[in-house]
Every structure is written in structure tokens, then in C-alpha cells.
A protein has these predicted regions:
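N-terminal Rossmann-like NAD(P)+-binding domain of SDR-like oxidoreductases, especially those catalyzing
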Residues: 1-185, 225, 319-327, 333, ...
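C-terminal substrate-binding subdomain of Rossmann-fold SDR/epimerase-dehydratase oxidoreductases
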Residues: 4, 15, 20-23, 57-60, ...
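A short beta-to-alpha transition loop/helix N-cap that caps and shapes the active-site region
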Residues: 37-39, 136-137, 188, 253-254, ...
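Proline-centered turn/helix-capping motifs that create local helix->coil transitions or kinks
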Residues: 116-119, 127, 137-140, 174, ...
Length: 348
């Protein structure tokens, strides 16, 4: 039984990944600080597994991280832990810099020391879950793994810095890394500050559906289960010292995406007054430094790992909308105590 240290395993992507590993009977050590976006419901779900252990810990905590590597035999570290919402990085970049850069440094440095201390070095690897946003806005074509990194937000700059740090450890110390750069994820349990769940919940509650700028910014969407499948395949089949893009099949403007969600809600949960959800759409001031388009070339992972996304956007949105409609106890608590849907990321 392999033992995996999952950092950020109570977050959106991390929790889905932990669940998948546990279902495959792997041993999981889930390390998470339990910030505002953590899903406590999933933590309770994981308690039933005998091969699971949770440790509340900040990845910036040098002493605790060092002790974890001292007390456990770890086959791989998969780091999801990060501050991830671009708007929050505009409001408060400090947490993004310290967590996404210094925290990753702490993990990488301790992983290197651990790797140097074990005999079976070929069995260990460090996987960093990065983002497509490190490439910046793409006017033509699609970003490949060797494309220039050109971040435009404090969030993407912090993730780019972590990527560069890891690459430097590979060049300097031969550190066994793999970096993953997925496109925008969506699906069940996503904290409702992100576009898709925010639009779904605002629509259900009859609130405005805010569209930044003219709504023509383009994103590439990836259903959460497809991303988890890709990460798991790379964990077992990926090549050390490589970067892998993980992209969805479809690019779409934000306004078209929101209108698609509205049309699905009109059918799945029609309003009593028969008004269309689309009437709630409201154009608001654009996000500062808003990237126009993200686009990934994922041919490398297809060729080397034989991975392709299985869930198209139409099907993924359908599944996601139905999940939020059926799990209002989960998100109503968040809306009441953590985040009511207010605008974030305004100009200073």
C-alpha cells in the first residue's frame, strides 16, 4: 500500500483527489489548514477509511512539516494547498505570496531532505498542482508546456514563482518533480466565490448575475472528475522532470457560459413567475488586469499518459447544477457564515 501526502486535501480539487485515492485503497495523509474554502463535510466523510489520517497544518509551518516527513514513510507529495481566487489576490496579495511561494518552498525543501535520506529514491516524487494562468493571456493558438510564462495577477504570479522554484530545485539538486497546469475546474463542492457556482446560487436566490466587463473573456473549462483522473494517471505514469498541461475540450466566453447556465436552470428549475434567469445578468466593472483568454495545448498528456477529458461542458454543467440544487444544506451554510456572494477584487 502506497502512502501519499496530500497537501490541501480539504479544498475543492484536493478533496476529490483524496476520495479517489481512498477508494483505490491507498494510504492518505491529508494535510490542510482548513481555511475559509475548506469543505468540512468531506473531512467527515473520509473518517470512515482506516487508511486515512488528517493533520491540521499550515504548509508554511517549518517545524510541523519537518516532523511529518520524520514520522511517516511517504511515496509521493501532491500539493494542492494554495490560495486560488484571483479576486482575493487583488484585495489581499499577502496570503498568496506567503502561502503559494513560501509555503511551497517549505514543502519542497523538506521533500528534498526526505528524498536524500531514503534508499528507494526512484519511488518518490513531488507533484505540484499549478494553473494555466501562469501562461498569461493568449491571443492566438494554445499554450504548450514550454511556452513563456507571463502571469498578470498576484495569484498567477505566486503560482509562477512556485513553478520556477521547483524547476530550480530540479536543475540544482535533481529534485524529482512533476508540475501540472490544469485549466479552470468546476463541479460539486466548489466554493461559491468561483464563477460557475456563484452564478448558479445567485440565480437560485434571485440575485444579480455579475459579468465582468463585456463578458467576452474566454476560458477553457475542465470537469473536476476529469482533472482528478488526469492527476492520478500522472501520479503513477508521469515522467519525473516534466510539466503537463491538463485542459478541457471547449473554450467559451464568460457571457455565453452564464447564458448556458441560465437556460439549463430555466428547464431544470423554472421560476414561478416564468421569468427567464437571463434577465438577472448584470454587467459590472471589469476585474483589474483581467486576462482575455486562456487556452491549453494538452497533446502531451494525451500522447504520453493516454488521457482525454470524458465530460463535455454541456454534461458537466448539467451535473454541477443538479448537485447544487440537491445539496443546499452544504452551500446555504457557506452563504450565511462565510461568503454571501459580494464583489471581490475591486480596484484600490
Amino acid at each position: 500500500m502506497k502512502c501519499f501526502l496530500i497537501c490541501g486535501g480539504a479544498g475543492f480539487i484536493g478533496a476529490h483527489f483524496v476520495r479517489s485515492l481512498l477508494n483505490d485503497n491507498h494510504k492518505v495523509i491529508n494535510l490542510d489548514l482548513l481555511t475559509y474554502a475548506a469543505s468540512l463535510q468531506t473531512l467527515h466523510e473520509f473518517k470512515k477509511y482506516k487508511n486515512y489520517r488528517f493533520i491540521k497544518c499550515d504548509i508554511r509551518d517549518k517545524k510541523k512539516i519537518k516532523n511529518i516527513f520524520k514520522n511517516f514513510k511517504i511515496d509521493a507529495v501532491i500539493n494542492f494547498a494554495a490560495q486560488t481566487h484571483v479576486d482575493r489576490s487583488i484585495d489581499n496579495p499577502d496570503e498568496f505570496i506567503t502561502t503559494n511561494i513560501l509555503g511551497v518552498f517549505n514543502l519542497v525543501n523538506n521533500s528534498l531532505n526526505y528524498w536524500n535520506s531514503i534508499k528507494k529514491k526512484k519511488q518518490f516524487k513531488f507533484i505540484q498542482v499549478s494553473t494555466d494562468e501562469v501562461y498569461g493571456s493568449v491571443s492566438k493558438g494554445s499554450s504548450k508546456e514550454f511556452s513563456c510564462l507571463s502571469p498578470n495577477s498576484p495569484y498567477s504570479a505566486s503560482k509562477t514563482s512556485a513553478d520556477h522554484l521547483i524547476l530550480s530545485y530540479f536543475k540544482t539538486f535533481n529534485f524529482p518533480y512533476i508540475i501540472l497546469r490544469p485549466s479552470n475546474n468546476y463541479g460539486p463542492y466548489q466554493f461559491p466565490e468561483k464563477l460557475i457556482p456563484l452564478i448558479i446560487l445567485n440565480a437560485i436566490e434571485g440575485k444579480q448575475l455579475p459579468i465582468y466587463g463585456n463578458g467576452k473573456n474566454i476560458r477553457n473549462w475542465l470537469y473536476i472528475e476529469d482533472n482528478v483522473d488526469a492527476i492520478k494517471k500522472i501520479l503513477f505514469k508521469g515522467k519525473i522532470g516534466n510539466v503537463y498541461n491538463i485542459g478541457g475540450k471547449e473554450e467559451i466566453t464568460n457571457i455565453k457560459l452564464v447564458k448556458n447556465i441560465c437556460k439549463k436552470l430555466d428547464r431544470i428549475k423554472p421560476k414561478k413567475n416564468k421569468r427567464k434567469y437571463e434577465t438577472l445578468i448584470t454587467y459590472v466593472d471589469d476585474r483589474p488586469g483581467h486576462d482575455q483568454r486562456y487556452s491549453l495545448n494538452s497533446s502531451k498528456i494525451k500522447k504520453e499518459i493516454n488521457w482525454l477529458p470524458k465530460t463535455n461542458l454541456d454534461r458537466g454543467l448539467e451535473l454541477t447544477i443538479k448537485w447544487y440544487l440537491e445539496n443546499d444544506n452544504w452551500w446555504k451554510t457557506i452563504r450565511k457564515f462565510k461568503y454571501k456572494g459580494e464583489r471581490l477584487g475591486k480596484k484600490r
